[in-house]
Design a protein with these regions (language model features):
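Juxtamembrane intracellular "pre-TM" segments in multi-pass secondary transporters
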Residues: 2-7, 188-216
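Extracytoplasmic gate region of multi-pass secondary transporters
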Residues: 31-32, 212-254, 261
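Conserved MFS/SLC helix-loop-helix module at the cytosolic interface between two early adjacent transmembrane helices
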Residues: 62-97
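Cytoplasmic membrane-interface "Motif A"-like loop-to-helix N-cap segments
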Residues: 73-83, 272-285
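Cytoplasmic helix-loop-helix junction between adjacent transmembrane helices
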Residues: 107-143
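Helix-loop-helix hairpin linking two adjacent transmembrane segments in secondary transporters
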Residues: 139-187
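C-terminal transmembrane helical hairpin of 12-TM major facilitator-type secondary transporters
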Residues: 277-322
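A late C-terminal transmembrane helix in Major Facilitator Superfamily
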Residues: 333-366
Length: 407
C-alpha cells in the first residue's frame, strides 16, 4: 500500500500543480505596479485603487473555510479544476468599462485562490511522504512567488506595449491552461484517501479553533501584512517620493517575490533536514521588521533594494514552516488539512486586506508614507509570539514525537 501511495506519479502531479501555482501568483499582485495608471484611468484615490488587492484578499479570507469544506466534500481533483477556471477571470478585463467591474473580476479571481490554496495542501499531503512535505511546500510556494515576481516585473513594460487591459488579459491565460491540463491529467491519490474515515465537519472543528491554529494564524497575519502592504505600495513610494521611474521601481519591488521564488525550495530542503519549525518562525519575526524598515527609511537606494531582497529571503523561510506545521499536527489527515490551512490563512489574509488599505488611506490623510509603513513593518513581531508558544511539530520534536495540539 505504501509503495502505491508514494508512487513516482506524484512528481507528475506536482508538475501540473506548479502550472496552477505560477498562474495564481502571476495574477495575484500584477495590478499593483499599474496602480498609477489605473488611478488616472478611472480618476480614483489611492485608498480606492487599493481595493484591487484588498477586495481580492477579502474574498479569499471569507471563502477559505467554505473552500476547505468544498474540497472535503467534492474532492481535491474537481476542486482544483474549478479553482483554475475562476483564477483565469482576468481574461474578462477588456470587457470592463468601470472600476467596479474590475473589482468584481478580482473578486472572482480571489474565489479561485481560496479554493486552490487548501486544495494544493490536500493534494500534496495525499501524494507525498511526510519527510517530503517541507520540500514540496517550498517548491509549491516557489511557483506562486515566481508568478508574483514575473507579474510585477513585466506588468509595466507589457502595458507600455499593449495597454493595461490586455496585459491583465494575457496573465489570465495561464491559469486557464493550468485548469485544462489538470482536468486532463490530475487525480486524487485513491490509496491515500480510502484509508481515511468519512469526512465530518464536527470532528474537524477542534483542529480549526484550537490554540495552536490561532497562534500560527496570528503569526501568518504579521508576515502577510508586510508582504502584501509593502508589495502594494513600495513601487508608488519609490516613484512619488524618490523620483524613481515607475518601471524601475516595480522591478525593485519584484525582487521581493523573486527572492522568495528562488529560495523557497532551498528553504524547504533545509527545513526537511533540520526537522524543526519553531526557530524559523521566531527568526522571521525578528528580522522582517528590520528589513521592512530599511526598505524605505535608509537614504541609499542600493541598501533599500538589498532590504527588499532580504524581505523575500526571510519570507521564504517563514512560509515553508507555516504551511508545513498544519500538515504535521497530530490527527490531521489529507481530507482535513485543507480546513486547517484555510483557518490559518484566514487571519493572514485578513491582515492582507487591511494592510494596503491602511497604508493608502493613512498616506492620503497624512500626505506621507512614513508612519503607515513604520506601523506595518512592526506587525510581524506576532511571529515571535507564535515561535515561542507553539509546540514543535517537526521530526526533531521532544522524544522524536510531535507534541499534541492543545485546545
Amino acid at each position: 500500500m505504501q509503495e502505491e501511495q508514494y508512487s513516482p506519479h506524484r512528481w507528475v502531479i506536482q508538475a501540473m500543480l506548479m502550472l496552477l501555482q505560477v498562474g495564481m501568483g502571476l495574477n495575484f499582485m500584477s495590478p499593483t505596479p499599474l496602480f498609477p495608471v489605473i488611478m488616472d484611468e478611472f480618476e480614483i484615490s489611492r485608498s480606492a485603487v487599493s481595493l484591487l488587492v484588498s477586495a481580492t484578499i477579502i474574498v479569499i479570507t471569507v471563502a477559505l473555510l467554505p473552500g476547505g469544506l468544498l474540497i472535503a466534500k467534492m474532492g481535491s481533483r474537481r476542486s482544483m479544476t474549478v479553482a483554475g477556471v475562476l483564477m483565469s477571470a482576468h481574461l474578462l478585463t477588456p470587457l470592463t468599462d468601470s472600476f467596479i467591474l474590475l473589482v468584481i473580476i478580482r473578486l472572482v479571481f480571489g474565489m479561485g485562490v481560496a479554493i486552490a490554496i487548501p486544495a494544493t495542501s490536500a493534494i500534496i499531503m495525499e501524494w507525498f511522504k511526510p519527510s517530503e512535505l517541507p520540500l514540496l511546500n517550498g517548491i509549491t510556494e516557489s511557483g506562486r512567488s515566481l508568478g508574483v515576481a514575473v507579474g510585477v516585473f513585466v506588468a509595466v513594460p507589457v502595458t507600455n506595449l499593449i495597454g493595461w487591459e490586455m496585459t491583465l488579459l494575457s496573465f489570465g491565460v495561464l491559469p486557464l491552461i493550468g485548469a485544462f491540463v489538470w482536468m486532463m491529467g490530475g487525480r486524487s491519490n485513491v490509496s491515500s484517501t480510502t484509508l481515511e474515515p468519512p469526512f465530518s465537519i464536527r470532528d474537524n472543528i477542534p483542529f480549526m479553533l484550537n490554540g495552536n491554529t490561532l497562534l500560527l494564524a496570528a503569526g501568518m497575519a504579521g508576515a502577510f501584512a508586510v508582504f502584501i502592504g509593502f508589495s502594494s505600495w513600495l513601487p508608488a513610494y519609490y516613484n512619488e517620493v524618490r523620483g524613481i521611474p515607475l518601471e524601475r521601481a516595480s522591478l525593485v519591488v519584484a525582487l521581493l517575490p523573486l527572492m522568495a521564488a528562488v529560495l523557497n525550495p532551498v528553504s524547504g530542503l533545509i527545513q526537511s533536514r533540520l526537522g524543526k519549525r519553531k526557530p524559523m518562525l521566531t527568526m522571521a519575526g525578528l528580522t522582517l521588521p528590520v528589513f521592512a524598515l530599511g526598505s524605505f527609511l535608509v537614504p541609499s537606494q542600493i541598501i533599500a533594494t538589498v532590504c527588499v531582497m532580504c524581505l523575500g529571503a526571510i519570507f521564504s523561510i517563514f512560509i515553508v514552516a507555516a504551511l508545513t506545521i498544519p500538515m504535521e499536527l497530530p490527527g490531521v489527515k489529507s481530507s482535513s488539512v485543507g480546513l486547517v490551512t484555510a483557518a490559518v490563512l484566514t487571519m493572514g489574509n485578513f491582515a492582507g486586506v487591511v494592510s494596503p488599505i491602511f497604508v493608502g488611506s493613512l498616506t492620503d490623510f497624512l500626505g506621507s508614507y512614513t508612519v503607515p509603513f513604520c506601523i506595518i513593518a512592526l506587525v510581524p513581531l506576532t511571529l515571535v509570539i507564535a515561535g515561542l508558544f507553539l509546540p514543535e511539530t517537526g521530526k526533531r520534536a521532544t522524544n522524536g514525537i510531535p507534541k499534541p495540539a492543545t485546545s
